Amino acid sequence: MSAQIIDGKIISQTVRQEVAARVKARTDAGLRAPGLAVVLVGQDPASQIYVGSKRKACEEVGFISKSFDLPSSASEQQLLDLIDELNQDPTMDGILVQLPLPAGMDCTRILERIDPEKDVDGFHPYNVGRLSQRIPKLRSCTPKGIITLLERYNIEVRGKHAVIVGASNIVGRPMTLELLLAGATTTTCHRFTQDLEGHIRQADILVVAVGKPNFIPGGWIKEGATVIDVGINRLENGKLCGDVEFDVACQRAKYITPVPGGVGPMTVASLIENTLLACEQYHSA
């Protein structure tokens, strides 16, 4: 068996085109374009690249994008004051604060300061709570993007055993909620999990998000499984790889996401979808 590649680049581009068409329909009808405020604190090179890709995506689909770059010396209160201003700005439907934040800033306090109706990253406890109550609105971008991939490839989730490796607030925990909502029986593995191999060998759908290169041996993959690799790691030779041993896993899985070009592009596509949703649901005028 050689796994079918789940192409996140193609699906993300399709999603962007769909959003762009809806934005054009809005503006043709005399409504304003959705607005996204992107806040970057400091000079972290990786964060600058991520922010650049998000700003470019906004331009592609016809959004109004505003950039707010604060120096690494900015105080937590300065960032909170900026968020307060953006919460009151009627032209901004979404507020994105790029993570990680500089040391010393209270990430939880800052993310909770964002109006839940403008929380297009889907990190606010209100939005995570809505997902857990089966009434999602603004959903965490990476898990939402993964669900989109499964849907677009017509991969059955209902009744399947889904195993999530990693329990972060950004991916693992909301991913468990998304798969539960989709009808899967879920197992979430973390650093205290015993017999990780045993859990993985039972997975019809495996989602791995731990940030360790080739952490999951390909030989552990169940025959015919769907493998979603969220990790993106740079090796000493400069090449990128995921958290799953890709070449071996390909011989056992039915579907698999590559790294790069799998989950990553879907995170930005989901952010764009969330911003349009926030505009249509909460701030449309």
From Swiss-Prot:
GO biological process: L-histidine biosynthetic process; methionine biosynthetic process; purine nucleotide biosynthetic process; tetrahydrofolate interconversion
Keywords assigned: Amino-acid biosynthesis, Histidine biosynthesis, Hydrolase, Methionine biosynthesis, Multifunctional enzyme, NADP, One-carbon metabolism, Oxidoreductase, Purine biosynthesis
Annotated transmembrane regions: none
Regulation affecting activity: The NAD(+)-dependent dehydrogenase is activated by inorganic phosphate.
The enzyme's E.C. designation: 1.5.1.5, 3.5.4.9
SUPFAM superfamilies: Aminoacid dehydrogenase-like, N-terminal domain, NAD(P)-binding Rossmann-fold domains
Subunit structure as annotated in this protein's UniProt entry: Homodimer.
Function: Catalyzes the oxidation of 5,10-methylenetetrahydrofolate to 5,10-methenyltetrahydrofolate and then the hydrolysis of 5,10-methenyltetrahydrofolate to 10-formyltetrahydrofolate.
Family stated for the protein in its record: Belongs to the tetrahydrofolate dehydrogenase/cyclohydrolase family.
Protein name per its UniProtKB record: Bifunctional protein FolD
